[in-house]
Amino acid sequence: RKILILFVVALIGFASCADSKQSMTVTVTNSLALERAGEMVEVPMSDVVAKLKLADTAQIVVLDVDGQQVPYQVTYDEKVVFPVTVGGNSVVTYTIQPGTPAPFDVIACGKYYPERLDDVAWENDLGGFRAYGPALQARGERGFGYDLFTKYNTTEPILESLYAEELNPEKRAKIAELKKTDPKAASELQNAISYHIDHGYGMDCYAVGPTLGAGVAALMAGDTIIYPYCYRTQEILDNGPLRFTVKLEFNPLVVRGDSNVVETRVISLDAGSYLNKTVVSYTNLKEAMPVTTGLVLREPDGAVVADAANGYITYVDPTTDRSGANGKIFVGAAFPAQVKEAKVVLLSEKEKKDRGGADGHVLAISEYEPGSEYTYYWGSAWDKAAIKTPDAWNKYMAEYAQKLRTPLAVAY
């Protein structure tokens, strides 16, 4: 009997030792007074594999303090990313261990649309975005900046269905036919399929043109913005469920007489965030230059915040319908590193014509060193969705910038 008890105790001890080897505790510390809800943290997959001694085919689960599964994603650069919630000045723990993950809803995702002039469009639960491609440029259209899709009444992906309806070949043919015989019916059908009209889930009511749009970065020669054009190549690196990442490379720019400066952007959007992280680099640049992130202004006296010290800029955009029927779009950019200067720059009457009627930009200007990376965050919200007022948007942006400058500490 004594031998049996000792054997059972030994077995329990062995099992508990094995369990401890087969789990990894991740401690997340928030040193700000602000709650951090749904913020993504990253753990290198190589560390998880080493810690858990995982076989190549093994799966993992991420558990919260109550033992409930948390959705996660392994990214293209081999990181386990998952959302955490931690109160102000607090610490929370998560556990990573072998197991079969539950199915996760796809929240952040995107697609390349060769059928729509090479658009790359992506979204999460809060909004959508797009960058224009080489086919648009080949047509002579000047769409330099990022475009926006508003979103409400759903957290599910909608862009694929919006594009499918907008580009529906049968309906397009019908519209062309009706234009000859019944222009009113043609217009009604056009409106019924257009993503420029809100059909209950959101729309594209943002004007870009030959501007920096909703937050493109550009080098500056003195006070002159060197506008990038459409991307040249695209590669989707992550496509959900929690993070979308795309790499865009651009045609060579002419910078101070050098015609071989090539810009690369890596843009990622996480579930639950209004802002895209963007990492910009320029190859073959020979000297340090100012780099700016800009938000196009469509009203010269529009509501603008340009706060260099606290690292963010915002603007209230009137949308393409100045009557107010489409509400207002809040746009903004936030910066983890120190911003040299933030200001409004209005255009002359001649420049307005060159920039499609835009009034100017609110700019955040930093210094770019050759061989480095310039990282910033940009995005938008809509007053028909969760963020209703400019004050609420400015608060979100100010807190976002604070969080960027005081990141969560992750230990394991």
Question: Each PLM stretch: what is its role?
Answer:
Residues 21-23, 290-349:
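Polysaccharide-binding surfaces and accessory modules of carbohydrate-active proteins
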